[in-house]
Swiss-Prot record:
The gene is glyQ. Transmembrane segments: none annotated. One of its GO terms (cellular component) is cytosol. CDD domains: GlyRS_alpha_core (cd00733). This is Glycine--tRNA ligase alpha subunit.
Length: 290
């Protein structure tokens, strides 16, 4: 049986053999692998780029106090970005499943059309959800626009739902029963690693977070992002864009933002992301290509 740790390592090994540069998770909280600079910023220029990485992801509104076997406020995506998109990308994906020990020919694999959008990143793309015996396990996206700019060449993003794949491969009904690792004769489960965190962060995000402080932090992060952009520093600016996005998500979980305000906050983060994209492209001398 493949452990969760082995699953991540096998995906890294497979995509490294396909020519992807393996980078490390980014050290700012974000809601998806797309937010990593290795995807968001690198998809903006015209140079070929292929990368893969584990993406710890936080979505405060999805927390369930560690009581739901299928919903988490923090989890792991595995992200692949290849630009330009290879013609055989679907075949490569199916081979990656084989590398995990899954014979896809014996299962019902479906590519279901599902176009993707990230309002806060000003990004959207055409693509599919990949369903394995009726369960979504992966998202394919051909980026059309990122940070409000057209993508040329078009990059393909593959986002694996690693916990769902692990549950399927290990034949367990709860994410907390996933075997994280086997250390000698000792088994470490997903619950051992993350269940307490799911409870505490759910309580924080839904009940405890200081909303006044977070509103102030959002304004501070936005202001610092813009200041960095004025200094033509898109990478530090993007860090503060990520911070503003995470603070917004926490305020959203805390129900501190009305429906009308929510749209305004999304637009504010989108403008920060667009500013980062614009200054980044400008620094490469590619703004005219947007």
């Amino acid at each position: 049986m493949i452990t969760f740790s082995e699953l991540l390592l096998k995906l890294q090994d497979f995509w490294a053999k396909q020519g992807c540069t393996i980078v490390q998770p980014y050290d700012f909280p974000s809601g998806a692998g797309t937010f990593h600079p290795a995807t968001f910023l690198k998809s903006l220029d015209s140079k070929p780029w292929a990368t893969a990485y584990v993406a710890p992801s936080r979505r405060p509104t999805d927390g369930r106090y560690g009581e739901n076997p299928n919903r988490l406020g923090a989890y792991y995506q595995f992200q692949v970005l290849i630009k330009p998109s290879p013609d055989n990308i679907q075949d490569l994906y199916l081979k990656s499943l084989e590398a995990l020990g899954l014979d896809w020919r014996k299962h019902d694999i479906r590519f279901v059309e599902d176009n993707w959008e990230s309002p806060t990143l000003g990004a959207w793309g055409l693509g599919w959800e990949v369903w394995l015996d009726g369960m979504e396990v992966t998202q394919f996206t051909y980026f059309q626009q990122v940070g409000g700019f057209e993508c040329d060449p078009v990059a393909v993003e593959i986002t694996y739902g690693t916990e769902r794949l692990a549950m399927y491969l290990q034949e367990v009904e709860s994410v907390f029963d996933i075997v994280w690792s086997k250390n000698g004769g000792h088994i470490v489960t997903y619950a051992d690693v993350h269940k307490r965190g799911e409870f505490e962060y759910s309580r924080y995000n839904f009940e405890v977070a200081d909303t006044k402080m977070l509103f102030d932090w959002f304004e501070d992060a936005s202001r610092e992002c813009k200041r960095c952009l004025e200094e033509k520093l898109p990478l530090p600016a993007y860090d503060y864009c990520l911070l503003a996005s995470h603070i917004f998500n926490t305020l959203d979980a805390r129900k501190a933002i009305s429906v009308t305000e929510r749209q305004n906050f999304i637009l504010k983060v989108r403008e920060l992301a667009k500013g980062c994209a614009e200054v980044y492209k400008e620094s490469l001398g590619e703004l005219s290509e947007a």
